[in-house]
């Protein structure tokens, strides 16, 4: 939009001069009691904020588009713009309009971006707001991130292929990077995680001289920067950007934590999402996540630190055990736990108060909050020292009580100060002799005004006469029109204003008193502001001391929270090992249990160990609880690594370097990727990065493609993990063929979810049992989902037809030479009938089918042997029961329980008949088709007896 600057009014010209320096921002331009926006900014903001778009005369032929928001409520509008990815520049009046000569001087005092928000109303109390910078040099990257509201600063260097995982862990709200080409690789995670990527990089951000403005040379020399200067460069980008937006150097950024990402368990973006660590998959809400269950923190500082614990599981055994020991001390001491909770709930957000002090935006009320928090420190320290918590005592042994800071605020600031620092009523009179004297004058002035009011009432004869005040012409005498005619007014009364029902006057005496009073009140406000700034600056110089105390409080709060959760939910202290054995007894899913209650949750064991079983194949119908079981195993392992007690009867957890999850299905339509492609990409990531020390959760791999492709891929993936990676793996599948892997590899074991058939329906028992499932129960599940009866009945008919006629489902092979000849003969006959043009494709298809049939026989033969063994045992039981028929009756309840696990049921009256028929079967001399038909008939008879 081309604008002729020469035609603009002076004010509008000033606006555009400021706007041109902040072209990528929406400029909030202060005009009196409003922030106004003009031209393109007005068009954008009015739409985003849903406010009226008007116009203003600007010197051009057309009025300038304009919209505005009230100064006193601007924060809510700024918040909405920032949340929608806009940057907001605050153009403030730098002088008093009443004393300004000409146009009021205006300047941008700060730029608000997603990563530089300071206002508490725009921030989540228990979540950090990180600004992250990246400096890329080749494939190496320096990464630094800071929460400017607390001053927390962390830095590391890593390879570019690790950056996405690190960003997923940190979850910044804004990223700034020197390599604009690399931005494209960040688009996906930025979209998924709602991260603002700042593309307005300036080479000035690389000026490392900024480091000396924040840190002494001695401190910088002690820091372990990388040899290539990656961290120095990324830190310089960050600090220069902060200075450019906030227009000042801040003292709360005074300590850098340089860390190595290998110190923590690696969790990729998919795993964090699938396990719902800090927010749910649906709705992105904290409620329903692991963090929601664990968070009983009393302070905002503790809440933020707990989130960091969950996001960054430790892999150092001694550090994990130290946390566990502290939590155990608190959990086992009910009185200590309750006392600490009572103290902590009265402590304010000290970290963010420090941030506001550093940016000169702290209010008097917030300093009172700081004082009240410091007041709790002696009690906190004494409570811990009087307990038996030996390790916890170490945390507070050298904790600064900040007595000097407390005394300063207590002596100076009123308990109930005004909200704004320039309106007075902030400082106690006894803190300053000058202030005390001025307040006496002000107080007496009010008395003098009252005296004048009483005297003028007598003089004029108007009893309702009153003296008021406004900012336009100060003190005035008001007489209502009803009393005007009887009023005896002399020449000292000077009319100033006529209202509909009253007249207002001033007198020389009133003006003389006014000057004394107003001078005193203005001086009081000015002096109070000066004193407040001095107090703020004194505290500012001690921010590092206060921040250390805040960090100690946050740690104690997290320990108390985890101890409280462990006590309430009956969690146990896990053992931590380095021998790669995972052994969970009666484990529970913490989130699901929190919803349904411990008494309604069915616990399950998980055992994974080298030499015995490193891969568990889990079969069972949909909705039976496979995914919940696998997720709970991963979550219990992760909880142990953050130093938390876990929901189990006992748990022995190995140090894991990574947890991978491939759970659920979703299309990535924005990238043109199908469910199956997304699945394969995630599996590829796992196979490339998993190690022997990893835990892998795979759910229904291969379901996004054809049956044969799916089985082949799933089989091959399990083989690859077993032979090449050898990591602990839970592999859920509906391909029952994969249970044959147990025979191929001794470290692969079959498990399934127990199901009880109940007439036409099924009951999910939610219990993991050591055997593969023999049915998928798909139609049963469809019935539970309330599909139309017509659909269900038709599905049953089709299923029976498929089971009867399809080679793959109907033929069982012994695997010996004779039966292989039968299959080969059948295949030859089939091939003769095939059209010559389709010969090759048909042959390959039948060849694959033949191989699957051979494999399937082993599964069927194994199940038959088990079945036959159970039949024989059952026959013996029937004989025994007949002998003791007069002594006892069959316990029908026990019989039903047996049905749930074996899925075999016989009426006690007819058991001997059916058993005799089973014993007379000569299964090994039957053809495969005869064998399967005989088994089918026996199953049918058993069902008839049951019904």
From Swiss-Prot:
Entry binding sites for ATP: 620-627
Highest taxon, organism lineage: Bacteria
A GO MF term: damaged DNA binding
Gene3D superfamilies attached to this UniProt entry: 1.10.1420.10, DNA repair protein MutS, domain I, MutS, connector domain, P-loop containing nucleotide triphosphate hydrolases
Record keywords: ATP-binding, DNA damage, DNA repair, DNA-binding, Nucleotide-binding
Coiled-coil annotated spans: none
GO aspect biological process, one term: mismatch repair
The keyword ATP-binding is assigned to this record: yes
One GO location term (cellular component): cytosol
Family classification: Belongs to the DNA mismatch repair MutS family.
Record's function text: This protein is involved in the repair of mismatches in DNA. It is possible that it carries out the mismatch recognition step. This protein has a weak ATPase activity.
Entry protein name: DNA mismatch repair protein MutS
Organism listed in the record: Clostridioides difficile (strain 630)
Record lineage: Bacteria, Bacillati, Bacillota, Clostridia, Peptostreptococcales
């Amino acid at each position: 939009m081309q604008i002729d600057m020469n035609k603009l009014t002076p004010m509008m010209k000033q606006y555009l001069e400021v706007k041109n320096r902040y072209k990528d921002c929406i400029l909030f331009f202060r005009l009196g009691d409003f922030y106004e926006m003009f031209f393109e900014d007005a068009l954008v903001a009015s739409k985003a904020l849903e406010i009226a778009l008007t116009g203003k005369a600007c010197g051009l032929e057309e009025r300038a588009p304009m919209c505005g928001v009230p100064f006193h409520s601007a924060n809510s509008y700024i918040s909405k713009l920032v949340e929608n990815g806009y940057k907001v520049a605050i153009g403030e009046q730098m002088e008093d309009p009443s004393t300004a000569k000409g146009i009021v001087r205006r300047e941008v005092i700060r730029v608000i971006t997603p990563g530089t928000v300071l206002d508490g109303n725009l921030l989540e109390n228990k979540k950090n707001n990180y600004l992250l910078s990246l400096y890329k040099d080749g494939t190496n990257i320096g990464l630094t991130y800071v929460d400017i509201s607390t001053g927390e600063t962390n830095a590391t260097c890593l390879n570019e292929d690790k950056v996405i995982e690190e960003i997923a862990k940190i979850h910044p709200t804004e990223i700034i990077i020197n390599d604009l080409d690399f931005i494209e690789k960040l688009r996906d995670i930025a979209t998924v995680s709602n991260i603002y990527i700042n593309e307005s990089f300036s080479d000035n951000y690389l000026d490392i001289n900024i480091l000396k403005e924040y840190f002494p040379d001695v401190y910088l020399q002690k820091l372990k920067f990388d040899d290539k200067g990656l961290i120095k460069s990324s830190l310089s980008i960050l600090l220069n950007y902060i200075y450019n937006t906030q227009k000042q150097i801040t003292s709360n950024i005074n300590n850098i934590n340089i860390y190595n990402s290998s110190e923590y368990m690696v969790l990729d973006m998919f795993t964090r999402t699938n396990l719902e660590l800090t927010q749910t998959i649906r709705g992105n809400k904290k409620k329903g996540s692991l963090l929601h269950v664990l968070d009983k923190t009393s302070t905002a500082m503790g809440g933020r630190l707990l989130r960091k614990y969950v996001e960054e599981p430790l892999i150092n055994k001694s550090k994990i055990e130290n946390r566990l020991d502290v939590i155990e001390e608190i959990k086992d001491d009910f009185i200590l736990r309750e006392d600490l909770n009572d103290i902590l709930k009265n402590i304010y957000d000290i970290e963010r108060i420090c941030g506001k002090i550093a940016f000169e935006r702290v209010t008097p009320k917030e300093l009172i909050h700081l004082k009240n928090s410091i007041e709790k420190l002696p009690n906190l320290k004494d409570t811990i020292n009087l307990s038996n918590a030996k390790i916890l005592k170490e945390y507070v042994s050298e904790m600064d009580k900040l007595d000097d800071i407390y005394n300063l605020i207590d002596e100076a600031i009123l308990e109930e100060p005004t909200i704004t620092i320039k309106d007075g009523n902030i400082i106690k009179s006894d803190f300053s002799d000058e202030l005390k004297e001025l307040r006496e004058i002000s107080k007496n002035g009010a008395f003098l005004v009252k005296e004048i009011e009483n005297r003028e009432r007598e003089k004029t004869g108007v009893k309702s006469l009153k003296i008021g005040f406004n900012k336009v012409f100060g003190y005035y005498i008001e007489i209502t029109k009803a009393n005007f005619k009887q009023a005896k007014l002399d020449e000292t009364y000077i009319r100033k204003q006529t209202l509909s029902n009253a007249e207002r006057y001033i007198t020389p005496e009133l003006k003389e008193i006014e000057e004394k009073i107003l001078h005193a009140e203005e001086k009081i406000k000015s002096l109070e502001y000066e004193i407040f700034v001095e107090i703020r600056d004194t505290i500012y110089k001690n921010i590092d001391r206060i921040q250390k105390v805040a960090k100690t409080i946050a740690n104690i709060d997290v320990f108390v929270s985890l101890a409280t959760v462990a006590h309430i939910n009956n969690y146990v202290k896990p053992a931590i090992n380095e021998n790669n054995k995972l052994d969970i007894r009666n484990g529970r899913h913490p989130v699901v249990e929190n919803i349904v209650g411990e008494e309604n949750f069915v616990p399950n064991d998980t055992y994974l160990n080298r030499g015995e079983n490193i891969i568990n194949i889990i079969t069972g119908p949909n909705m039976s609880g496979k995914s919940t079981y696998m997720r709970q195993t991963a979550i219990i392992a992760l909880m142990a690594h953050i130093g938390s007690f876990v929901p189990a009867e006992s748990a022995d957890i190995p140090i894991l370097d990574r947890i991978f999850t491939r759970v659920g299905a979703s299309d990535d339509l924005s990238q043109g990727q199908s469910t199956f492609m997304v699945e394969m990409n995630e599996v590829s990531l796992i196979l490339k990065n998993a190690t022997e020390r990893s835990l892998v959760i795979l759910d229904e791999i291969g379901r996004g493609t054809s049956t044969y492709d799916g089985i082949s891929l799933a089989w091959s993936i399990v083989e690859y993990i077993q032979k090449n990676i050898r990591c602990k793996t839970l592999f859920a599948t509906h391909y029952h063929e994969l249970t044959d892997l147990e025979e191929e590899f001794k470290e692969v074991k079959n498990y399934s979810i127990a199901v009880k058939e109940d007439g036409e329906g099924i009951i999910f028992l939610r219990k993991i049992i050591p055997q593969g499932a023999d049915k998928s129960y798909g139609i049963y599940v469809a019935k539970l989902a309330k599909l139309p009866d017509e659909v269900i009945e038709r599905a049953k008919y089709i299923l029976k037809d498929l089971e009867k006629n399809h080679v793959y489902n109907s033929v069982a092979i012994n695997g010996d030479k004779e039966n292989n000849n039968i299959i080969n003969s059948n295949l030859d006959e089939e091939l003769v009938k095939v059209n010559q043009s389709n010969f090759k494709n048909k042959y390959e298809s039948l060849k694959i089918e033949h191989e699957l049939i051979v494999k399937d026989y082993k599964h069927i033969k194994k199940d038959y042997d088990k079945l036959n063994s159970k039949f024989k045992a059952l026959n013996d039981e029937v004989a025994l029961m007949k002998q003791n028929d007069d002594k006892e009756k069959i316990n029908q309840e026990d019989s039903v329980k047996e049905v749930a696990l074996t899925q075999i049921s016989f009426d006690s009256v007819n058991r001997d008949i059916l058993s005799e028929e089973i014993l007379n079967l000569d299964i090994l001399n039957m053809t495969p088709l005869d064998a399967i038909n005989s088994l089918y008939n026996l199953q049918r008879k058993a069902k008839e007896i049951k019904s």
